[in-house]
Amino acid sequence: VIEGISCLDYLVMYTKFKIFNKPEDNKLDTVGEHEIGINKVDYDGTLWDLSVKDWETYVDYNLRDVELLVLLDEKLQYINLIRFLSHAGLCGLSQAIDTVPVINGAVAIKARQHNKYISTFFRPARIGKNPGGAVQDPKVGHVRNVVSFDANSLYPSIMISLNISPETKLGKVERNGDDVNIQHVSGRTFTLTKEAFVKYMKEEKASLSKSGHLFTQKEKGLMPEFLDNLYTKRKDMKNLGKEKEAFLNQNKSILSQEEIKKLEVDIQKCDTFQNAYKICLNSMYGYMGNLYAPLGDDDIAASITLTGQAINGKNRDLFVEYMQNTYGISDQEAEACCIGADTDSGYFSLYILEEKHGLNLLEDGMVSDRFYEECDKISEYINTHISEWVIKNFRSLDSRIVYKRESVCDAGIFLVKKQYVLHVLDDEGLKVKKFKYKGVAVVTGKMPKVVKPYIKTVIECLILEKDRDKCNGYFNDAYEKFKELPHHNICHISGMNNFEEYSKKCDGLKMANKMPVALKAAYRHNYMIRELKLDGKYPKFKTGDKVRYVNLKTPNRYGLETIAFHDKYPKEFEEIFQVDYEKQFDKIVFASVKSFYNAVNWTLRKPNENVRIELEDFLS
């Protein structure tokens, strides 16, 4: 340890702050290519061998690693972000990566401004888990004319609206026949008549969360004040970034390359810092449920999530109410418009308005003014009535719950909870034409990067054209290209935990009971490295490594079904084990595309199978 020197792991920072558009894994080579288009020096062996055999390349290898980190931070600004969080939370640079130290320090500053002091005592562990956010099962299938309405920072807004803070908590309410029991924070229990309870609520200016907890609103709490300040700063930073992005888009043709680069860096900086504010805002709920947070409180955590569930459910109800009141549609038609909901948002289809009322989404290839106007009317209706509802139901004196139009999409497909693909034409007011992938296999780190474009081509054709013959053509083309790819481009990718624990229970090539597939493949790799006396040539797997593994053709000399490797498939394995490309294609490409075909009731056949023509295909 060198006093005054902080050690920051850029991998940890990248994992923490990279929220959207993530690469398939967090290796420096992958991240460098993904973010700045530069790779590490290509070398497959151990660094020790490289240093002995080729010192000059060894030096270049290390210099390139340093260069990559410098260029990455020039773009991402994560070190500045850590410095900002460190100052905001009165903690060391290495501590600023964690939520608890930053919020402790930031709230302590806010408390001191009011001549208050925060607790430093740890609370007892809660039995069981706090309730989480509710996610609605979506209407599975192809959808058109979709608009999403998203709550502005729902959980922080709930804390501000109900003045939720440790020092404002009064107790918990429980019904007792016609009376009301209050379990007060002092430890005492009071029983009040309904009339006395109403009087008590008025005197305390108390809000009532969905979990039944009371919070006084006589004075603004530390947490709501802290969140209010963060929310304002994030909004300002986000608006600044949008202004710079709009200016760049409008003037790109007349700006110099130097000016464009500076604007792009400024836009990235704005995005990084608004995301930092967002992380702090959204971390407050997690902080409240954290056993090691001095100000943590499970009653507050439950109050936030259960109130959030109720509010997002009301958002859906108000949309249905608006559609029925304005257009006189039936309950069944209104229900069909409600596509799905995440924790803080709802997805609705307005296609029925195009069918029955001539409200077209598109006009000259762009979202029509009439469609925007209708979205604004829906948003206004939801916000007016949800504010009234929050004030009435939760006794809020300062409702901050606001739903805004997030995305306008002409088409998309929903599979299951939190898994969908949408073709977005408007993203928070910015006119775009892009696909938004959420939760599906093709955007996870478990799928090889080279394979993803083949699958996306099929999915995007299905969404925009819904042409089965064309989609099948793309799928068959993907199969032909897949067969020509090297092994490292068609492998499964997985993380690995508890590897040593499972490995100890293995006996030769007899695997431990319930050992995960990726761990089996990694164990077999290590076994074969020893068996073939390749210890100095290829590193062995250990817990925490990213595992690439493939299915093998059977039978083979060792009877193995799968085997793992690091970056490149060892040539020594080639002589013993043949990779089963058919099975790899089935598990990676076929399985992914099949889920989308199933969603629209299409049948997907494997390209290598000779199957009879089904009646539905003959008649279609």
Question: Where would I find each of the regions flagged by the language model?
Answer:
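Active-site palm subdomain of RNA-directed nucleic acid polymerases
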Residues: 40, 312-343, 355
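Active-site-proximal helix-loop-helix substrate-binding element of RNase H-like nuclease domains
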Residues: 1-66
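Catalytic palm subdomain of template-directed nucleic-acid polymerases
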Residues: 346-377
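Catalytic nucleotidyl-transfer cores of nucleotide-processing enzymes
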Residues: 1-5, 123-294, 403, 414-445
